[in-house]
From Swiss-Prot:
Function, in words: Reversibly transfers an adenylyl group from ATP to 4'-phosphopantetheine, yielding dephospho-CoA (dPCoA) and pyrophosphate.
Protein name: Phosphopantetheine adenylyltransferase
Cysteines engaged in disulfide bonds, as pairs: none
Alphabetized InterPro entries for the sequence: Cyt_trans-like (IPR004821), PPAT (IPR001980), Rossmann-like_a/b/a_fold (IPR014729)
Organism: Roseobacter denitrificans (strain ATCC 33942 / OCh 114) (Erythrobacter sp. (strain OCh 114))
UniProt keyword terms in alphabetical order: ATP-binding, Coenzyme A biosynthesis, Cytoplasm, Magnesium, Nucleotide-binding, Nucleotidyltransferase, Transferase
Gene Ontology molecular function: any one: ATP binding
GO biological process, one term: coenzyme A biosynthetic process
Cofactor(s) for this UniProt protein: Mg(2+)
Top-rank taxon: Bacteria
Family designation: Belongs to the bacterial CoaD family.
Length: 166
């Protein structure tokens, strides 16, 4: 069984994340979405909210693809999380060259820690290359329209969270 781990903070989950989940589903038998507990990033949404959003959105993809998709909160090393969930592949999305430079370094470190776990990069589709959770939150805070970047449910949750609910 090919088990993959797609880690992220998902604060909030975007259409770019969902695109990677959909595309990874064609490559794997099971996908674990690792929701990182990253206190240094100071997420807007608490862990429970982020997990709930990821689950609500990924269940739709699981229903369409038949892939088993589960969420797994983690705050340990990514490579340890991969071992914990039985993943042999780490899935990462790339938007630009800057992402590649960082991810390339991470792959090197992860290979030193466990050379049996591979990392697979999926390039973001053109319409998703500019999407970043940080930018989506900033646009929402400044009154901009984020409907092109997140699902309607995530849009409502984000606007509610920042006090812009209609």
């Amino acid at each position: 069984m090919r088990v993959g781990l797609y880690p992220g903070t998902f604060d909030p989950i975007t259409l770019g994340h969902l695109d990677i989940i959909r595309r990874a589903s064609a490559l794997l038998d099971k996908l674990v979405i690792g929701v990182a507990i990253n206190r240094d990033k100071g997420p807007l949404f608490c862990l429970e909210e982020r997990v709930a959003m990821v689950e609500a959105e990924s269940i739709k993809i699981a229903a369409m693809t038949g892939l088993e998709i589960v969420t797994h909160p983690f705050e340990n090393l990514l490579i340890d999380c991969a071992r914990d969930v039985g993943a042999t592949v780490i899935v990462r999305g790339l938007r630009a060259v800057a992402d590649f430079e960082y991810e390339y370094q991470m792959v090197g470190m992860n290979r030193q820690l466990d050379d049996t776990i591979e990392t697979v990069f999926l390039m973001a589709e053109a319409e998703h290359q500019a999407i970043a959770s940080k930018l989506v939150k900033e646009i929402a805070r400044l009154g901009g329209d984020i409907e092109k970047f997140v699902t309607p449910e995530v849009n409502a949750a984000l606007l509610n969270k920042i006090g812009r609910a209609g």
